[in-house]
Curated annotation (Swiss-Prot):
Reported cofactor(s): Mg(2+)
Role noted for this protein: Catalyzes the transfer of a dimethylallyl group onto the adenine at position 37 in tRNAs that read codons beginning with uridine, leading to the formation of N6-(dimethylallyl)adenosine (i(6)A).
Gene transcribed to yield this protein: miaA
Organism: Aliarcobacter butzleri (strain RM4018)
Protein name: tRNA dimethylallyltransferase
EC number of the protein: 2.5.1.75
């Protein structure tokens, strides 16, 4: 069995490439996308349709409802499930998506034993300041408004009495994916900008606004996934703060900002990877599978 990851910024063509490669290499697919995992979040997540997926088995799509929490630990369990299936059924495994943090966790591992359900009993800024005073070296790597990571660091401190740095020294991370070849799709900025604009336009024409109205009515705005790009801007439109034209423009702008963050993360975190334009990358991947 071979396993690969296809990464790249949002709207770079990862999904289409993964489907094409999977059909030629007897592969199953694990979606590396923190939004595709949710049922009923279809248009805004740009998840492949059932028709597009065809007979290719997918893990990580439509796993939970939007009011159910899904985090990196849940993703690790999904990876184990997908890999077990691939091994039992003599399949290859393609991991594809833009949530680089999940992929990083697969490669580097997570320290186990912390109760993920411990929540902040003080504000995010207060928790950050407290942790910074105790462990400046670790907290310098976290943005002050990054609620998820501040909450995790705070949970470590509350449960163990140790600073994150000391905790990770005593509980080294255990990597899960050890032989994972990473392929990255590259695009020129202006070309990607056109792709993002086109995808945003297609989303709106396909019923994005109606989808968000439905999701809000059923789940409210409270779940973490309801703060995703495409959803928050639509809430602004529904609140009368944006025109339809401004909605489309703002989603595209925020998507490009996300693409920049993804590219920066991929560049800094995944050093041993093959990067190429999409047409050439297709050939690179097929060559790897033929070795």
């Amino acid at each position: 069995m071979k396993e690969i990851a296809i990464i790249g910024s949002t709207a770079s063509g990862k999904t289409a490439l993964s489907l094409e490669i999977a059909s030629k290499t007897n592969s199953i697919i694990l979606s590396l996308d923190s939004l595709c995992v949710y049922k009923e979040i279809d248009i805004v997540s740009a998840k492949p349709t059932l028709e597009e997926r065809g007979e290719i088995l997918h893990f990580g799509i439509d796993e939970v409802y939007p009011n159910v929490e899904f985090d990196v630990v849940c993703f690790m369990e999904l990876y184990k499930k997908a890999k077990e299936y691939a091994l039992k059924n003599d399949k290859n495994l393609i991991i594809v998506g833009g949530t680089g943090f999940y992929l990083k966790a697969l490669i580097d591992g997570l320290s186990l034993g912390i109760e993920s359900k411990i929540k902040l009993d003080i504000s995010v800024s207060e928790a950050y300041d407290l942790l910074y005073s105790l462990d400046e070296m670790y907290m310098k790597k976290i943005e002050k408004n990054d609620k998820y990571r501040v909450e995790k660091a705070y949970a470590i401190y509350k449960q163990t009495g140790l600073t994150p740095t000391l905790y990770f020294e005593k509980n080294p991370k255990i990597p899960l994916a050890k032989d994972l070849k990473i392929f990255e799709i590259l695009w020129e900025k202006e070309d990607l900008k056109k792709r993002v604009a086109s995808r945003t336009n297609t989303m709106i024409k396909s019923g994005l606004i109606d989808e968000i109205i439905y999701l809000e009515k059923k789940y409210t705005r409270a779940p973490n996934c309801m703060s995703s790009i495409g959803i928050v801007e639509t809430f602004e439109y529904l609140d009368g703060k944006l025109s339809k034209e401004e909605l489309e423009e703002k989603i595209s702008q925020n998507t490009m900002k996300l693409a920049k963050r993804q590219n920066t993360f991929n560049k800094g975190q995944f050093l041993n990877k093959t990067s190429n334009i999409i047409d050439n990358l297709n050939s690179d991947i097929l060559k790897y599978f033929s070795i």
